């Protein structure tokens, strides 16, 4: 056999479908993280495994590691704490409020692209340092939990009192395909900006491969005023206000140093591009020893404080105590040092006790005193170190727990007793739950209320479909659909919503007078179930819709209006709601929403078909309602969509609205959106639609619709899992 001839027929090589058709709808994001990629098996319960963990023993091992410097990657100042804080920070710091994606909740820093981002240089070493501890405790602690816990122990080992720690983060086992990190194809590009400096939604970092901002200033321009603008925008998109932002930057930069000992061109490729013998490590440097005092990461060479392994107020002392002038690191990066040679000998060397240095600051550090609003906060925290410590503790806890959902999911002995507004609190159940007879009585009340099938189904869907699997926010529990801001969202049809809620509140009030109680949150879901039950009966099928009580009603005081505003759908294909044209198509937005709802492609398909015939469009239009008998739970949507007797033509310049006409007579039959027609256009979705359009599919359609509906209604019922 020729040496040049490959003996294998590659199963995954060659040109892909997306190479041929780059705009092909990506349905693969609906089928991630399945049992096929997870080695733990379906019977593994991480929460139960974590409960058996000796957390104190893990923390003791981590504490010992902090000062156990390894020759292959020596600890700065003899302490790994600052490196581990950066590891935890950069794990959590990818979170963005726009879609709830990113964050520390899945251990995604282990995989591409995050493991190879320019901002994460050397964090590959940090994870290898904690591998022996992960190995020791095995599946009782996830990588996601261990990374955050290590950051906490690092802070505690250097004299800081943290607010607490919660376990419960479940690892993923493959890179996330659903997260849009930006359209750039080069590291540190910033095509994400338009206009004067408008950052693309939902992104929360200024350049590809950065966690937040460029520490040298916007695009490397050392302008502290401009840097403040970027800081405020990016931290706000991670749910942090100005006070939290200042505390996080100042608190984080109380410890450790940056690394820019030499020419960054001498640093090798990132982990995903490194050679196989590097064994998953990257950024191998040929500058001298490449480690310790010769390390290069960001290219900046900054140590902020004289006590870089102890909690102190020295960051603010130095920030306010000197006038600063621009200089460059040995690697050529912009940074700042005190004017007129001040501060000489104040800063210890990280690896040579005989050397001393001057304090240094990043452009983004100086933004904290150049920006007037940041300066006021910085000065207050400088003058009140106890307040600084308290705000940093709370902000750090929020940073590292923001994407975990409600505190009912939190595990372990160190969970704080205090519940915070950003956790979207819901009162605990304080009454016996309704029994089967109560549910039957309530169903009869709903049926006799005068509310239509469409109204109750649309309201229940609006309540439950706010859920985001990315950060486990939203959902039907809490009945926040009756509160600001959700009650006023156009997609929720405020007038119809107010009508439905008034009727349901009356039923609730009357029932609760009997001595038993049902929450409005439960009643909204139950009403939706009643609507589906009636619609199935209209179609000649008797069904039982699963309903599990146990939801409670949140108050307006427990609901941060600004925080919940980001959950408002800009589009919702399930309700044919597309008020604005975007650069991405309506069908792409549908798939994105389906992914946030943790739906598979079949579940998304059957829900669309059912919601259309139940007449639940947000604008009450007949777009996509391919049936002559609305409010009958039939497979008519699929039957009529796939009818070759209909031809379609766009009726809008944007080609987002269509008319279906009789192929022979030309008479109008239906109107449709792109979301409707994609189920006949996309080959994979058409294959699913054909299943439900078949003559023997009516019962399967109803069963599958009910299963998918029940899943959505219970997405935030963590107590049932």
Curated annotation (Swiss-Prot):
Cofactor note: Binds 1 heme b (iron(II)-protoporphyrin IX) group per dimer.
Entry keywords, A to Z: Heme, Hydrogen peroxide, Iron, Metal-binding, Oxidoreductase, Peroxidase
CDD domains tied to this protein: catalase_peroxidase_1, catalase_peroxidase_2
Transition state stabilizer (site feature) positions: 86
Binding site for heme b: 253
Required co-factors: heme b
UniProt keyword annotation of ATP-binding present: no
Molecular function in Gene Ontology: catalase activity; heme binding; metal ion binding
EC number of the protein: 1.11.1.21
Gene3D superfamilies according to UniProt: 1.10.520.10, Peroxidase, domain 2
PROSITE patterns: PEROXIDASE_1 (PS00435), PEROXIDASE_2 (PS00436), PEROXIDASE_4 (PS50873)
Crosslink position(s): Tryptophyl-tyrosyl-methioninium (Trp-Tyr) (with M-238): 89-212
Domain of life: Bacteria
Family statement: Belongs to the peroxidase family. Peroxidase/catalase subfamily.
Subunit structure and binding partners: Homodimer or homotetramer.
UniProt protein name: Catalase-peroxidase
Organism: Shewanella baltica (strain OS195)
